[in-house]
């Protein structure tokens, strides 16, 4: 609960900062940062946002601006008081806003930003996490915020960052509407009161803000007045308080006298020095997107990108274009160098593309302007055709916006293709945003082909470099009809998988897909450049064969037919069928899935979903096929034992052990890992020559049962010793 202190009639309430905010402020105050200047960028950016909000509200209700028509930002240094003041005529804050926004409710980015800072991130990232206001404490020992919202009285917020802040009704000079932030600067930060320094920082970070930023400075100038006026002013000056700085200082700096012989004898004049307030607009640059791209330097694009996004790094690529004809709009699109920390967070406020109508800012969170998978693109769209007072509901129905969106997507894909020609930069882009491209393939059927050309993967022949599907196709053998791929958790895991043995041995290249989103991507990407994509982990893998190989395969099928039937009987519903494999070389067996079922990797991903649909799990997971390698000695010996006695318990035990091991090596998980472990331990004992009966006699009280229950529930113990 806030403490209340009464000063006469004035009520001051004291609140404690929310714990994470207090921690952040402590970090800002007690750590040395070299680029403290970013505080000014953050405060100007906040002022600009407040102005955007009131202007947007005024589009539907012009009376909102009755409390002040002019939308502007003023910067007022006061060296005598050691204060730097920023005033905006934005929407202002109510008392509740003031308490919530400046201290008692932590933004989602507070903790994330502190973690980033402690991991070595730059302080200038603060704006991206939504806590830019607190950067004021980089230079200020005390901050006072005076604010007036149309729906509330004028209030003052004050804090010296000691873990608490105060809020009171403010009866000082009325500000009409908006917010005034007064920074009481630290003794060593007075450089931010100098004209040169303020101009430098505003030019560097905020020259493209869409509202006039005016610097108010007290300056001196010489003024020429007649001798009589000078005497009068001098007399007045002496009568008044010497410290009054509003009146001009009078200095005799020379006089002009005319010759007495002149016809019109002029009065004597004197020059005096007077103090005045100079107003200078610091951001007269017109919106960069309205200019000709040929006249804009890369540095200007970089500065605009930083002021637009609060990023501390330059952009990776830029696309500046205009569309004319039936529809007219201009756009400026940027690709950042890195993905933001909350790129795929559902609840995050989207502010990637700012929508303007005829240079008037409308909104910065327009979902209809760009598809979800391009949510990392930053920039500006300025339409000539949309109405100024357009609402969100109207935007959803707007045909104009649909055409703009289509053009933006087209230009983004052009930009990606241009970037792909620069291998180094494309590698950075792909590391940051490959998931977005794959999400696009899943969601955007219209542009699926163009997006697929941008994909890059490691393959069995690409070494450390990634390769495109186009390059893969160019290397395909004459007899090869399909693009072979495998999905899994890591490059090492899939490269050593049993599934790729035969394919690689035959000299065919295999694409390694190791991100969870690849599973969704290939479900939609059925083919590329006329070549179908075939998973080497699914049934029906057809490799080009000559007549001799076909004949050998038919012989193997006939030879192992009885073993396949027996294994199917033993495993029953665990597998759909047991067949001879054409994909194995050194492994005895593997588990493949049906053509339309999930792969082992997809099953793992789906099991990890907290909100999964169990009804889907049932029919998508069920179809497993066991493939055995007819050339492997284990399988051949098992065939001989089965033919000698198909009721041999050891055969049953071995079949299940082979199946469970194949499940693991194929990427699946076991339903009952304990029973499998016990079987393995028993084999280890046999291998070491340990007699189970002796062990059981020595440990009569052991909690573990003396014998592992046989596989089929038979009461007789399994005779695995015979196999050993």
From Swiss-Prot:
It is found in: Cytoplasm; Melanosome; Nucleus; Secreted. The record marks 126-127 as: Cleaved under oxidative stress. The modification Phosphoserine is found at residues 226, 255, 261, 307, 445, 669, 718. Gene3D superfamilies: 3.30.230.80, 3.40.50.11260, Heat shock protein 90, C-terminal domain, Histidine kinase-like ATPase, C-terminal domain. One of its GO terms (cellular component) is dynein axonemal particle. PROSITE patterns: HSP90. Residues 215-552 are annotated as: Interaction with AHSA1. Residues 222-270, 695-724 are annotated as: Disordered. In the resting state, through the dimerization of its C-terminal domain, HSP90 forms a homodimer which is defined as the open conformation. Upon ATP-binding, the N-terminal domain undergoes significant conformational changes and comes in contact to form an active closed conformation. After HSP90 finishes its chaperoning tasks of assisting the proper folding, stabilization and activation of client proteins under the active state, ATP molecule is hydrolyzed to ADP which then dissociates from HSP90 and directs the protein back to the resting state. GO terms for molecular function: ATP binding; ATP hydrolysis activity; ATP-dependent protein folding chaperone; protein dimerization activity; receptor ligand inhibitor activity; unfolded protein binding. Ubiquitinated in the presence of STUB1-UBE2D1 complex (in vitro). ATP binds at residues 46, 88, 107, 133, 392. The modification S-nitrosocysteine is found at residue 590. The keyword Nuclease does not apply. Residues 1-527 are annotated as: Interaction with TP53. This is Heat shock protein HSP 90-beta. The lineage of its organism: Eukaryota, Metazoa, Chordata, Craniata, Vertebrata.
């Amino acid at each position: 609960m806030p403490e209340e202190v009464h000063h006469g009639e004035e009520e001051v309430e004291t609140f404690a900062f929310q714990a994470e905010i207090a921690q952040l402020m402590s970090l800002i105050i007690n750590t040395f940062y070299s680029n403290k200047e970013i505080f000014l960028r953050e405060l100007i950016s906040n002022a600009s946002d407040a102005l955007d909000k009131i202007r947007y509200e005024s589009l539907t209700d012009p009376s909102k601006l009755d409390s002040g028509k002019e939308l502007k930002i003023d910067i007022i240094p006061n060296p005598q008081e050691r204060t730097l003041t920023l005033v905006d005529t934005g929407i202002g804050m109510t008392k509740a806003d003031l308490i919530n926004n400046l201290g008692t409710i932590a933004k989602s980015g507070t903790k994330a930003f502190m973690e980033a800072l402690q991991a070595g991130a730059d302080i200038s990232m603060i704006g991206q996490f939504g806590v830019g206001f607190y950067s004021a404490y980089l230079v200020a020992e005390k901050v006072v915020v005076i604010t007036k919202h149309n729906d509330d009285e004028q209030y003052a917020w004050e804090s010296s960052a000691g873990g608490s802040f105060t809020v009171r009704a403010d009866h000082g000079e009325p500000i009409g509407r908006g917010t005034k932030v007064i920074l009481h600067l630290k003794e060593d930060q007075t450089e931010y009161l100098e004209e040169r320094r303020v101009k430098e920082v505003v030019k560097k970070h905020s020259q493209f803000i869409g509202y006039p930023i005016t610097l108010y400075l007290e300056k001196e100038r010489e003024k020429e007045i007649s001798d009589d006026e000078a005497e009068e002013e001098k007399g007045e000056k002496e009568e008044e308080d010497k410290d009054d700085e509003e009146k001009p200082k009078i200095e005799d700096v020379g006089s002009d006298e005319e010759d007495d012989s002149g016809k019109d004898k002029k009065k004597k004049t004197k020059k005096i020095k007077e103090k005045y307030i100079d107003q200078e607009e610091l951001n007269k640059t017109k919106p960069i997107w309205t200019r000709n791209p040929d006249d804009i330097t890369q540095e200007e694009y970089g500065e605009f990108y930083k002021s637009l996004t609060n990023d501390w790094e330059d952009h990776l690529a830029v696309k500046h274009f205009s569309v004319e004809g039936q529809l007219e709009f201009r756009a400026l699109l940027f690709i950042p160098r890195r993905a933001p920390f909350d790129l795929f967070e559902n609840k995050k406020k989207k502010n990637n593309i700012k929508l303007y109508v005829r240079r008037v800012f409308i909104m910065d969170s327009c979902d209809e302007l760009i598809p979800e998978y391009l949510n990392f693109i930053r920039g500006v769209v300025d339409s000539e055709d949309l109405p100024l007072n357009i609402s969100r509901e109207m935007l959803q129905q707007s045909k104009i916006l649909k055409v703009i969106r289509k053009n933006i997507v087209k230009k983004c894909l052009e930009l990606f293709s241009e970037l792909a020609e620069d291998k180094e930069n494309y590698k950075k882009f792909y590391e940051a945003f490959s998931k977005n491209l794959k999400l696009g393939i899943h969601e955007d059927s219209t542009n699926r082909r163009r997006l697929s050309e941008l994909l890059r993967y490691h393959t069995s022949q690409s070494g450390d470099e990634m390769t495109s599907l186009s390059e893969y196709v160019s290397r395909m053998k004459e007899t090869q009809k399909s693009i072979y791929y495998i999905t899994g958790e890591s490059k090492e895991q899939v490269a050593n998988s049993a599934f790729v043995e035969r394919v690689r041995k035959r000299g065919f290249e295999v694409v390694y897909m190791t991100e969870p989103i690849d599973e969704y991507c290939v479900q939609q990407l059925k083919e590329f450049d006329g070549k179908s994509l075939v998973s080497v982990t699914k049934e029906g893998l057809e490799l080009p064969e000559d007549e001799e190989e076909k004949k050998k395969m038919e012989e193997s099928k006939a030879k192992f037919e009885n073993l396949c039937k027996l294994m199917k009987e033993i495993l029953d519903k665990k597998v759909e069928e047991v067949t001879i494999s054409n994909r194995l070389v050194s492994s005895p067996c593997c588990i493949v899935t049906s053509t339309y079922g999930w792969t082992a990797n997809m099953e793992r991903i789906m099991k990890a979903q907290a909100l999964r649909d169990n009804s889907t799990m049932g029919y998508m997971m069920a179809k497993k096929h066991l493939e055995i390698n007819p050339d492997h000695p284990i399988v051949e010996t098992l065939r001989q034992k089965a033919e000698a006695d198909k009721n041999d318990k050891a055969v049953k035990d071995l079949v299940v052990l082979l199946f469970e091991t194949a499940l693991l090596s194929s990427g699946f998980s076991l339903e009952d890992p304990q029973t499998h472990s016990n079987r393995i331990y028993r084999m280890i004992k046999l291998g070491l020559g340990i007699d189970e009966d002796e062990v059981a006699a020595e440990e009569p009280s052991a909690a573990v049962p003396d014998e592992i229950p046989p596989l089929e529930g038979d009461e007789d113990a399994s005779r695995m010793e015979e196999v050993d």
